[in-house]
């Protein structure tokens, strides 16, 4: 089993990363092949609204058509049996880099045609971990 862990925090040693590392260790203990990726290491942008993934005869196979440093990671997510995304919460939402990743990961799978759906070759499990700073009880 291949499991991809995606860290959407700029900090590689803080809470979000530690949660993902702990989950990754559990996957390793269950004999999974694990890959942990830090989104802030990748120079990429969110969806550029080119709509190439929406063309009737698109050959993108559920992947974003825009090519940049994120393309190999999107391919890893497509090929994984399961993946988990971890992100800190900033201004009530996941970090901007996490949202940009999710746009590029999920938008190609959405269809505007009610008669058909876009599907990946296989279904997979996904998990999300969000962290935020909050005061400790006194």
Locations of regions flagged by a protein language model:
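Short, glycine-/small-residue-rich phosphate/pyrophosphate-handling segment
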Residues: 96-97, 110-138
